[in-house]
Amino acid sequence: MEIREIPDLVSGLEKNFAELTNWIENQPNEKFEVSIRPEKWSTGQHLAHLIKSTKPVNLVLRMPKFVLKWRFGINNREEKSYEALVEKYKQKLAEGGTASSPYRPTFISAAQKYTLITEFNDELKKIKTALPRWKDKDLSRYIVPHPLLGKITVRELIFFTIHHTRHHLETIQKDYS
């Protein structure tokens, strides 16, 4: 999958957010809060985790570029492709990487389902508003810290968000279908 340009990034986000949202909307409400095992997240917890992990993306996209440069620096390496970033993420997970505490959800009730779906889709709307304001070259220039992947470019952060949403969709489909 060749994803590089801003319209492709937006399209990838829209597709994965829509598929995840549709799947969750069609899941019976009583299953939204139930976990298949104590160490596994419920569908609601997966959704809450995705919201928690998408909010910083919006923060980065709205942050002045001089602040990004001052806080984190600029890229000095070859940028990873979508596929290479996904492979690095899978490798980190295989090595035992997990969500750090700020991104771990607490119990989520079935009553929160539609509020969380709305909040998740609102995060996508914010990305879709902010991302086109970026110049393509700046997506590759500025870097930000990622708790599992280290310093990554803003484009790689968007790659991650596309894949991360897909990863959680596939997980809940496997665990709760």
Kindly give the residue locations of the regions a language model identified.
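Charge-rich, low-complexity N-terminal segments
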Residues: 2-5, 9-12, 23, 31-47
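Short, helix-capping/interhelical loops that line the mouth of catalytic, cofactor-
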Residues: 1-8, 56-119
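Residues that cap or delimit alpha-helices
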Residues: 27-28, 135
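A short small-residue
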Residues: 30-31, 100-108, 144-148
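Amphipathic alpha-helical packing segments from all-alpha helical-bundle domains
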Residues: 22, 120-130
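Hydrophobic packing residues in well-ordered alpha-helices of helical domains and bundles
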Residues: 6, 13, 116-120, 158-161
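Short, contiguous alpha-helical
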Residues: 33-86, 125, 131-177
